[in-house]
Amino acid sequence: MPRPKKCRQLSSCAPCSLFKPNGIPAVELTHIQLEADEFEALELGDVKRLSQIEAAALMGISRQTFGYLLANARKKVATAITQGQALRLPTPKDKDLS
């Protein structure tokens, strides 16, 4: 039986819902969804430059889980940029679901 999922504390949302290459309609692109907790990890780790221990404590998760979320977020962002895909960002509604 899997462990129960911990409720994560999220404090931010993206200022927009989609990043995509210029000049290509969104309907023609493959979309990658950045989850709310991955977005939060990216902001705390890379924008605010918190240590993994500090950021994990703010989110109410383990350092290992924070590292996993950060690695996933970085991979999704890098994939979207290098392969010309659309990156869907979490909305306030998505934040409430995490």
From Swiss-Prot:
Q: Which InterPro entries match?
A: RNA_pol_sigma_r3/r4-like (IPR013324), UPF0251 (IPR002852), WH-like_DNA-bd_sf (IPR036388)
Superkingdom of origin organism: Bacteria
Give the intrachain disulfide bonds. none
Gene3D superfamilies per the record?
Winged helix-like DNA-binding domain superfamily/Winged helix DNA-binding domain
For this chain, the family text in UniProt reads: Belongs to the UPF0251 family.
- UniProt xrefs under PANTHER family: PTHR37478, UPF0251 PROTEIN TK0562
Q: Which HAMAP family match?
A: UPF0251 (MF_00674)
Q: What is the protein named?
A: UPF0251 protein Sbal_3699
> Lineage of the native species?
Bacteria, Pseudomonadati, Pseudomonadota, Gammaproteobacteria, Alteromonadales
